């Protein structure tokens, strides 16, 4: 039957359009899959699907000695591996009452800040690429290459270092390496100035990031945010100042904060944090060149004997063998240790039962709390803004899925 203009049209149900963002999308930063519900080009709902990189890290750690558990932490946030080892080592040291010598603390802080540069350089450059700028990653990766060489010269590995140990670090840094790190720190600010000139004041970059993904301070705290996500919203909360660990209380640095809590503020905070990390690294280098001393605890329960000693003493050889096969025993108890990782507060809740293996090791990954807010942050924005918001969260799937 033909419809006239007056006759009733049959009702056609209008439903929103659903698309998959990832897991192969270049802006998904890993194996993230998000189901987006779109009304035209406006995002109505975001449903993140996680678990594609789940490896059962927390359970695996329960079957390993305290020393054997360290390499698992490199594989969480693989953009800044040593920062995660740091949290685990702090937890073990607090539980076992181990003192770390001053030189060991300085090396740890130095390499934690190198990790912060590695992570922030990767984030700000790929974030710029997500919104259309192609040059920053080429510049950023040149500097990251030098920093990864510092990792390699200290531990033998560019990424999965396993360099931090309960009680200190594996071995001392050569004098030349410390000098080279100092030389890098003196030239690094010019790269940040170049990035600032190219990206920070860029009109198109600002149009893509200003007033996108705004988080008020109340919302940030309610969602369990930490790190740059809180500082970008105006709270000067940094564990290096709020709950100082190692020798951070002796170092001079500032905590940059944002005003509006949008993607642009988070980017600017990360840029300024790199300058502050550079400042911390220079202070560590100056002190390492002047102050000698041990780099690991002198408590022989947790530190292996020297190579030369093992060639002379049968007891030292037995001690070395026992330490690396059975490991050291940690008293019963529970402890929470957190570090200011590049992504936010990375925490380790460790339960010891008096044996040589952890009874339970709960990992508090900052990216996990940040990812859950994707629906809240993207609702009402355009489809193109989803990758901008995701880039400003700085998510790595090693730590989200664990």
Curated annotation (Swiss-Prot):
Pfam families: Complex1_49kDa (PF00346). Its EC number is 7.1.1.-. Disulfide bonds: none annotated. InterPro entries: NADH_Q_OxRdtase_suD, NADH_UbQ_OxRdtase_49kDa_CS, NDH1_su_D/H, NiFe-Hase_large. It is a peripheral membrane protein. One of its GO terms (molecular function) is quinone binding. Signal peptide: none annotated. The keyword Cell inner membrane applies. Keywords: Cell inner membrane, Cell membrane, Membrane, NAD, Quinone, Translocase, Transport, Ubiquinone. One of its GO terms (cellular component) is plasma membrane. It catalyses: a quinone + NADH + 5 H(+)(in) = a quinol + NAD(+) + 4 H(+)(out). PANTHER family: NADH DEHYDROGENASE [UBIQUINONE] IRON-SULFUR PROTEIN 2, MITOCHONDRIAL, NADH-UBIQUINONE OXIDOREDUCTASE 49 KDA SUBUNIT. HAMAP family: NDH1_NuoD. Belongs to the complex I 49 kDa subunit family. NCBIfam families: NuoD, PRK06075.1. NDH-1 shuttles electrons from NADH, via FMN and iron-sulfur (Fe-S) centers, to quinones in the respiratory chain. The immediate electron acceptor for the enzyme in this species is believed to be ubiquinone. Couples the redox reaction to proton translocation (for every two electrons transferred, four hydrogen ions are translocated across the cytoplasmic membrane), and thus conserves the redox energy in a proton gradient. NDH-1 is composed of 14 different subunits. Subunits NuoB, C, D, E, F, and G constitute the peripheral sector of the complex. This is NADH-quinone oxidoreductase subunit D. It comes from Azorhizobium caulinodans (strain ATCC 43989 / DSM 5975 / JCM 20966 / LMG 6465 / NBRC 14845 / NCIMB 13405 / ORS 571). The lineage of its organism: Bacteria, Pseudomonadati, Pseudomonadota, Alphaproteobacteria, Hyphomicrobiales.
């Amino acid at each position: 039957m033909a419809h006239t203009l007056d006759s009733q049209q049959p009702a056609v149900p209008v439903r929103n359009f659903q698309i998959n963002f990832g897991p192969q999308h270049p802006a998904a930063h890993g194996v993230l899959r998000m189901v987006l519900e779109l009304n035209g080009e406006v995002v109505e709902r975001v449903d993140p699907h996680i678990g594609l990189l789940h490896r059962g890290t927390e359970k695996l750690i329960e079957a390993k000695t305290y020393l054997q558990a360290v390499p698992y932490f490199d594989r969480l946030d693989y953009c800044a591996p040593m920062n995660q080892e740091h949290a685990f080592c702090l937890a073990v040291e607090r539980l076992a009452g181990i003192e770390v010598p001053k030189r060991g603390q300085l090396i740890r802080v130095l390499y934690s800040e190198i990790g912060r540069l590695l992570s922030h350089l990767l984030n700000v450059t790929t974030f710029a690429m997500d919104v259309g700028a192609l040059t920053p990653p080429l510049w950023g990766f040149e500097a990251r290459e030098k920093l990864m060489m510092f990792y390699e010269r200290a531990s033998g590995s560019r990424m999965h270092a396993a360099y931090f140990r309960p009680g200190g670090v594996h071995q001392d840094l050569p004098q030349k390496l410390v000098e080279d790190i100092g030389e890098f720190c003196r030239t690094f600010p010019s790269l940040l100035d170049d990035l600032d000139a190219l990206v920070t004041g860029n009109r198109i970059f600002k149009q893509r990031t200003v007033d996108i993904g705004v988080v008020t301070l109340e919302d940030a705290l309610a969602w369990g945010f930490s790190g740059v996500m809180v500082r970008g919203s105006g709270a000067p909360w940094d564990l290096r100042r709020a709950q100082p660990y190692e020798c951070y209380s002796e170092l001079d640095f500032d905590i940059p904060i944002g005003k509006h809590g949008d993607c642009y503020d988070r980017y600017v905070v990360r840029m300024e944090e790199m300058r502050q990390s550079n400042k911390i690294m220079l202070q560590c280098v100056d002190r390492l060149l002047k102050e000698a001393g041990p780099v690991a605890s002198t408590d022989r329960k947790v530190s292996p004997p020297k190579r030369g000693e093992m060639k002379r003493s049968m007891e030292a050889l037995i001690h070395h063998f026992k330490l690396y096969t059975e490991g050291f025993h940690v008293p019963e108890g529970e402890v929470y240790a957190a570090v200011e990782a590049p992504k936010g507060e990375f925490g380790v809740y460790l339960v010891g039962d008096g044996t040589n293996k952890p009874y339970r090791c709960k990992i508090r990954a900052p990216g996990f709390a940040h990812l859950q807010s994707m629906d809240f942050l993207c609702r009402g924005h355009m489809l193109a803004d989803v990758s901008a918001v995701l880039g400003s969260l700085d998510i790595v799937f090693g730590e989200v899925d664990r």
